[in-house]
Amino acid sequence: MRTMSLNIGTIHFVGIGGIGMSGIAEILHNLGYSVQGTDIADNYNVERLRKMGIRVHIGHAAEALGDARVVVVSSAVKADNPEVQAARAKLVPVVRRAEMLAELMRLKSAIAIGGTHGKTTTTSLIAALLDTARLDPTVINGGIINAYGTNARLGASEWMVVEADESDGSFIKLPSTAVVVTNIDPEHMDHYGTVERLHEAFRTFVENIPFYGFAAMCIDHPEVQALVARVPDRKLVTYGFNHQALVRVEKLSMDITGARYDVVITDRVTGATRTIADIHLPMYGEHNVLNSLAAIAVANELGLPNDVVKTALGGFKGVKRRFTRTGEAKGVTVIDDYGHHPVEIAAVLKAARSACQGNVIAVVQPHRYSRLSSLFAEFCTCFNDADMVIVADVYAAGEKPMEGFDKAALVKGLQEHGHRRVMALADSKALAPLVNSLAGPGDMVVCLGAGNITSWAHALPADLAALPDPSPGGAE
């Protein structure tokens, strides 16, 4: 069954190198559709798509549209984009990314993972469980799954696992058989305007599942627990550390290899319980344990056996830019993480604290002036588990600077909120010398942000190794 004819013509993606756009483009290409696209610069995703035979033009221009018969855009693409303008002049339909994703989902029984944080890892964990059960799912994720080397794969079964992006509200249009809600925090307020509208969008996301579907919901988060009470006529499976959760953790311990725990599953109708004992998850942090509980809740609803759950989680290879170890130099471990919201930063640093024997040094590149502005108080209090904080310039992501919300303001704000060791980073070239003066064997440097700080994290081990050891009692 197809919803779109293969003869629809060329599908053109504006911003094809984006993590969400590239996944959809890859799946469409693998299904046999003619796909092309543009982006402002080469990146990993662009090169990957080119190797598959997809044409990608660097730079945005009306001529790049060619003979495309439909144009796909993300929320980041503005109406004045020359390709969008050319498409509309030619009466070529321009559709949002979520609309094209919805077309793919109509072919499958889809599980959509939503929430402010944890979507990408949870999507990857659910995909791993279905893979291990030999259910061969189609997957479209918001991050590179290390086991695949890509953020998308085309499977042969009826199942599909997708990350649902709530940033522009279009996730409510996704036709899902089941959904996951990991948490709900104030984010993307430039779109929603009010917290109430954000909450209402998540309510719609859950209520849109069919009567035979289900929603896995983390009731450790107060807004998700409140949402549970507002959705009476759908099957809801709660999970968390909360003792009232239907899927909950017991006997949690963590060491250098990750987390070990039991999971108790309660039947919401009969009250009967069963336990999956001695699960090993090779990831750090309670937030990742919660992500695994979401996957276990889904697995339980699909009837997957305990040994599949334990094998899949125990062999999980992680997601690119989610607590990714980029290397070690002079006994200092360097971590790259996508965390850019205060809740994510706090969770990552808590995980680093549990995994590190020495000092935790956070290097943060704030992402967008608007986010730093709207969550400034939270940014000033989310670094408590870091012994030292290095603050880089804001990664603008196309935004104009906002007075009073920049690198200097965050340094000052952290100091005023009681953080004892905070310093500004002059530029990326200054990072290795600064870390060299601060870090010692057993320490961990955690690079945080959604911008180009990932390249700094990957370069840092070699840059650090090339520097002479600092003199005793070196710079503070």
UniProtKB/Swiss-Prot annotation:
Pathway(s) served: Cell wall biogenesis; peptidoglycan biosynthesis
EC numbers, comma separated: 6.3.2.8
Pfam hit, one: Mur_ligase
Keywords attached to this entry: ATP-binding, Cell cycle, Cell division, Cell shape, Cell wall biogenesis/degradation, Cytoplasm, Ligase, Nucleotide-binding, Peptidoglycan synthesis
Organism: Paramagnetospirillum magneticum (strain ATCC 700264 / AMB-1) (Magnetospirillum magneticum)
Keyword match Cell cycle: yes
Catalytic reactions on record: UDP-N-acetyl-alpha-D-muramate + L-alanine + ATP = UDP-N-acetyl-alpha-D-muramoyl-L-alanine + ADP + phosphate + H(+)
Record's keyword annotation contains NAD: no
Identification of the protein by name: UDP-N-acetylmuramate--L-alanine ligase
